[in-house]
Amino acid sequence: MTTDVEKPPQRNGNHIKHKLIPSKLVSPPSGPQGPYRLPKNQHFRDHRRFGFSNIMLVLVILFLFAPLFVVITYSFNAAKGMRWTGLSLEWYKKLFFDSNELWRAFGNSIMIAFSSALVATMLGSLAAIGIKWYRFKARAYIQIASFLPMVLPEVIIGISMLIFFSAIKVQLGMFTIFAAHTTFNIPFVFLLVSARLDEFDFSIIEAARDLGATERQALFKVVIPSIMPGIVTSMLMSVTMSLEDFVITFFVSGPGSTTLPLYVYSMIRYGVSPVINSLSLVLILGIMILALTLRRFLKTIAASS
């Protein structure tokens, strides 16, 4: 049922006319000067800005994903060069049945990437928690020093690692690559976990201690579950950085420790085989599956917390 509101009387000569208007059609003023109205050209400016943003977004996506699209497309090319001659699965057959050295290098990369990422994640996370938890004089200096490997050129880090391992007489090989990758991954883990800890309310730890929890119990039952998304993200980034590293690995590698980047680089003198394009597609699919699995894992953690 609608109620009618009387409109102010309108004078027409000597008579006053009254007109009833439904209250649903009466818009109350939104301010002291009545309802706000956009300028006439405001909608045009917003539409133009929206269109420009879309164009820039498309250009950025093309810049990022066009090389991947080219690599995936030419992995199905029958010819070895850039000239397209037709679809073929020849390079995938060679990848899975005639590329023993490539798979050996790929296995070395996977083993070093996950092992170094695991150790770097544990050390970097504990370091970030310790820096945020305890107060001491050298705290600021340690934070600054932890960022140095991130800003130093990889060539300098690689040469420093080589000199260090030579000084302590450690034979170059898988262990030296593992140690080097762990070293340069720790600062990235420290940075990501520290950013997550900045959002953490440490009064929860005090409440847990008041309820009788020890420091170790508060760490494993309160702190770590709360920052687990940051820990998992830092580990994934460490794996990615270890897989693609070439410069530092080049300095600290030895006989029998060829990784995938080193193997691809050694092929340049003879020409890179299209088998690498096929391997790229396999890696992309593997990383996508890993990312989706971690995304589901992080959602489960967020829902449980």
Model regions and ranges:
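Interhelical loop and adjacent transmembrane-helix boundary motif
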Residues: 43-49, 92-101, 242-295
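Non-cytoplasmic
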Residues: 70-79, 189, 231-265
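Membrane-interfacial helix termini and adjacent extracytoplasmic/periplasmic loops
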Residues: 36-43, 81-82, 89, 138-139, ...
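Transmembrane alpha-helices
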Residues: 55-56, 61-68, 190-194, 200-202, ...
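Transmembrane-helix boundary motif in ABC transporter permease subunits
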Residues: 41-46, 114-146, 163, 219, ...
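Short membrane-interfacial helix/loop motifs at transmembrane-helix boundaries
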Residues: 66-100, 250-255, 305
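C-terminal transmembrane helix and the adjacent membrane-cytosol boundary/short C-terminal tail
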Residues: 4, 8-11, 15-22, 28-37, ...
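Loop-to-helix entry region at the N-terminal start of transmembrane alpha-helices
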Residues: 101-108, 163-186, 230, 235, ...
